[in-house]
């Protein structure tokens, strides 16, 4: 599927590289085919500046503004459209926030996270296994259940019962034969 997030005034963009990396702004004006004017009045570091199109990722969200509007108008339009709140709920924003939090975390916090992940995996596996015993859903349990069902059908014939009895008798006879050899 082709991305249709075209560059236009009012389009929300994320800065890819540089000192403003992963910050969000709005295209206020298009300078030329390679550069745009970007601003975010609610972010102190995102004052109105020129950005290369190679350095911005257009997002699907838009703000209804005219080209080269004032900061006041842009701030009001962003507040009424609630674009920053909508962006904060997107998967990419959540991923970036998690990445930033992990990078800023201390050694001990990363250790705690590893321990918590291990614990969560252990308990979820334990609960899954308990439920799998009651009502099999994993492929190996289902396959085992099918094999046992087919074995019951085969074992119910008189010839199969005879073979099973013969095998049981042979198994019982083996230990006694071993004892006799050890006595001699």
From Swiss-Prot:
It comes from the Eukaryota. Residues 160-174 have a biased composition (Basic residues). GO terms for biological process: ribosomal large subunit biogenesis; translation. Transmembrane segments: none annotated. Gene3D superfamilies: 2.30.30.30. InterPro entries: KOW, Rib_uL2_dom2, Ribosomal_eL14, Ribosomal_eL14_dom, Ribosomal_eL14_KOW, Translation_prot_SH3-like_sf. GO terms for cellular component: cytosolic large ribosomal subunit. Pfam families: KOW (PF00467), Ribosomal_L14e (PF01929). One of its GO terms (molecular function) is structural constituent of ribosome. Keywords: Ribonucleoprotein, Ribosomal protein. Residues 149-184 are annotated as: Disordered. This is Large ribosomal subunit protein eL14. It comes from Trypanosoma congolense.
């Amino acid at each position: 599927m082709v991305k249709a997030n075209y560059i236009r005034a009012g389009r929300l963009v994320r800065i890819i590289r540089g000192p403003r990396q992963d910050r969000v702004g709005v295209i206020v004006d298009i300078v030329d085919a390679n550069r745009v004017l970007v601003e975010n009045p609610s972010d102190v570091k995102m004052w109105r500046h020129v950005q290369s199109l190679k350095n911005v990722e257009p997002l699907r969200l838009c703000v209804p503004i005219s080209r080269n509007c004032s900061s006041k108008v842009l701030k009001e339009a962003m507040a009424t459209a609630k674009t920053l709140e909508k962006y904060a709920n997107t998967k990419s924003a959540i991923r970036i926030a998690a990445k930033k939090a992990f990078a800023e975390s201390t050694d001990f916090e990363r250790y705690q996270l590893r321990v918590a992940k291990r614990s969560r995996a252990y308990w979820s596996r334990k609960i899954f296994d308990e439920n799998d015993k009651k009502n099999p859903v994993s492929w190996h349990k289902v396959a085992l259940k099918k094999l046992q069902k087919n074995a019951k059908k085969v074992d119910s014939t008189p010839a199969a019962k005879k073979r099973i009895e013969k095998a049981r008798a042979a198994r019982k006879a083996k230990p006694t034969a071993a004892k006799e050899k050890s006595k001699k």
